[in-house]
Amino acid sequence: MTEQLLLHGTLEVKIYRIDKLHQRSRFNLCGKGNKEPTGKKTQSQIKRLTDSCTSLFGGHLYATIDLDRSRVARTMMRRHPKWLQSFHVYTAHSISKIIFTVKEDEPVSASLIGRAYLPVTEVITGQPIDRWLDILDENRRPIQGGSKLHVRVKFTHVTQDVNWNKGIILPSFNGVPNAYFNQREGCKVTLYQDAHVLNEYPDVTLTGGQVIYKHHRCWEEIFDAIWEAKHLIYIAGWSVNTDVTLVRDPKRTRPGGDLKLGELLKKKAEENVTVLMLVWDDRTSHEVFKRDGLMMTHDQETYDYFKNTKVRCVLCPRNPDNGDSIVQGFEVATMFTHHQKTIVVDSEVDGSLTKRRIVSFLGGIDLCDGRYDTVEHPLFGTLNSVHANDFHQPNFDGASIKKGGPREPWHDIHCKLDGPAAWDVLYNFEQRWMKQGSGRRYLISMAQLAEITVPPLPIVQPDNEEGWTVQVFRSIDDGAVEGFPEDPREAASIGLISGKDNVIERSIQDAYVNAIRRAKNFIYIENQYFLGSSFGWNSRDINLNEINALQLIPKEISLKIVSKIEAGERFSVYIVIPLWPEGKPGSASVQAILDWQRRTMEMMYTDIIIALRKKGLDANPRDYLTFFCLGNREKGKVGEYLPPEKPEANSDYARAQESRRFMIYVHSKMMIVDDEYIIIGSANINQRSMDGGRDTEIAMGAYQPSHLLSTNNMRPVGQIFSFRISLWLEHLRVTTNAFQCPESEECIRMVNATADELWGLYSAQEYPRNDDLPGHLLSYPISIGSNGEVTNLAGTEFFPDTNAKVVGEKSNYLPPILTS
């Protein structure tokens, strides 16, 4: 077997051209050979040859780059095979060779011309390779005419990255390289946990009583921002429900707070505020099919509500880009979504009666039903108050307020950007509106904006300790935005990736990879999904070539832990995910996702255990990497809502109601690194969100220059640190000094022990307490074998109150592209 080596770092690849490509003729496509005929006769011959080749090849040839089985790049399609195209590729793959494949595009798929190979043993040295490679057929023989492909390859090992393992070092740190949006200095950032925080919830304090974090209230601040807008309100969402009420806390009323979202937006439009909405068009929501659609996003209802009003609401399908084949185009249009959740408004400027500023919101929370929740995450106690008209429980058949709880609690994270980065969120909306809205029609022009707003300049002075530096990232392609350059060289210069005949931005995945590589001490993740790096999965019972869940984040995390074990340094990773993905837990789609998740975990724990053994350490892998979920269990209370109906006997619904427990659904999309850097957005840690050509996403990465590991060699104690402590207080209901050093064995073991105890209380057949569950952070119910294999926790084959397997089950009929 050919030797495999770990290629962990960055590949710089340039594909130039093919020297000649014969096809039943002595002439070649590129016009290069031993003799160059001249004259009108020869020109006629060449024209006939070109016409015949266009017929044979469709006039469209492209090349791909594979790391063994993993496709990492592809060129644009060209009539003649001369690309001159460069690629910046992050790698974390154990491979034997780099494969360059030349294909002819066809309407349905593509046909193979040939492949060229470059052994990893040559690449891994780091020396530049500039070479003509033989193009071979499937039997490894030169194709007709002995054609060659000209490539240049340069590998840089991850340890040679100037930021590797160093955190953020100023002034040299310039943000994530090769990204579409640059990092913006002098911003303000507001961080939100959940849609609302009650007055009774305490501020976060350190030992000695020092207040380090005051809570902000997401939906109230969104309401205020919309209410106070004078010129523009731009909303993009996966789901927008006109019936939701943003302000519900009776102790925090305000003028207009009783308005529903739809009423509020119509009111603002009547005040001559430009209100534009981009709502994902669920292709399954159609009068002919099911009006609310398979995803129940209310898109058609929202569109109908605003019809013939001053609010401009556009339903946006996830249109395929021009480079997709018919099959790929069908996949994109029917399987993928517009998943961004953004709001852009104008807001007042202190000290100015005429000028306004741009403020943007982004994150995981859609403006729709089921999202309003507090850090208490009640199951039954609010069904006769704030959730009486907002009962959300999609995990049980027939669930409704009439049959009672448990409702599905919702944990999420969002943020507000103020300053130059807020404008990048505005630009994103404008690009999307021009592509799928109404062109420039209805958008406030840049000239008008210049008259009514202050320019996108820093709003915080460099010496202000509360200042932020922010960079906006996306997963998106030119099927969804206007303005991406067609020339691949121009696209590459602004951080874009050129595909067959499309242009992709994949900067969210790049942001995660860079942040993980910079990490020194710990990583804390909350995400709705956690699966990927399928190139590293065990292939004993699956064909890895069919999975294509290639995003690098899980492998980058396990390799970071391995590097720390090898160096004899502490490093801890905490990952919070839902108990299962939203939906019927025993359904084929949920079980398939859980199977991918289990394989991802297994790959990571295998890497860690191998590294521990090499160092002669008999350590628990959960001291380095640990997974959690959230759940609640409530005791009945006097005056609680009494449903007039009952769930079907012996159903999951009935059992959950009897046991009075249910998972808290983790919908967050957040990563904190070393308490100095945070990523928040709409992107899940799966292929759909990180691909760029699948679901469209937006995120931001941010830090406070005055609160870095490199500042005075002290631990950061800025807003990111405080936000993490606040989240841990929400989940664990306690704070301790150990939480200030998450990488320590003391901290991770304390958190694991508490979560183990809480899982025991949550899963117990008979609940032994007379009060609610004393914390929400539960150990994910898996067991880790001696070689890294992941199985269900002993005695927990199925999720509580269900017959659904904890570790999932491979689907034999659902396409992996749908569930990965």
UniProtKB/Swiss-Prot annotation:
Family annotation (PROSITE patterns): C2, PLD
User: According to its UniProt record, in which tissues is this protein expressed?
Assistant: Expressed in buds, flowers, siliques, stems, old leaves and roots. Expressed in the sieve elements.
**Binding positions (a 1,2-diacyl-sn-glycero-3-phosphate):** 339, 528, 667
Q: Where does Ca(2+) bind?
A: 194, 377, 411, 730
Task: Summarize the record's disruption phenotype note.
Answer: No visible phenotypes when grown under normal conditions, but increased sensitivity to salinity and water deficiency. Late flowering in slightly dry conditions. Decreased sensitivity to glucose.
Q: Which reaction does it catalyse?
A: a 1,2-diacyl-sn-glycero-3-phosphocholine + H2O = a 1,2-diacyl-sn-glycero-3-phosphate + choline + H(+)
Q: Which residues are the active-site ones?
A: 339, 341, 346, 667, 669, 674
Pfam families linked to this entry: C2, PLD_C, PLDc
**Signal sequence segment:** none
What's a Gene Ontology MF term here?
phospholipase D activity
Q: Which Gene3D superfamilies match?
A: C2 domain, Endonuclease Chain A
What is the membrane topology listed in the Swiss-Prot or TrEMBL record?
Peripheral membrane protein
Key words of the record: Calcium, Cytoplasm, Hydrolase, Lipid degradation, Lipid metabolism, Membrane, Metal-binding, Repeat
Summary of the function given for this chain in its UniProt record? Hydrolyzes glycerol-phospholipids at the terminal phosphodiesteric bond to generate phosphatidic acids (PA). Active with phosphatidylcholine (PC), phosphatidylethanolamine (PE), phosphatidylglycerol (PG), and phosphatidylserine (PS) as substrates. No activity toward phosphatidylinositol (PI) or PIP2. Positively mediates plant responses to hyperosmotic stresses and promotes root growth, flowering, and stress avoidance. Not involved in the abscisic acid regulation of stomatal movement and transpirational water loss.
Name recorded for this polypeptide: Phospholipase D alpha 3
Q: Which organism is it from?
A: Arabidopsis thaliana (Mouse-ear cress)
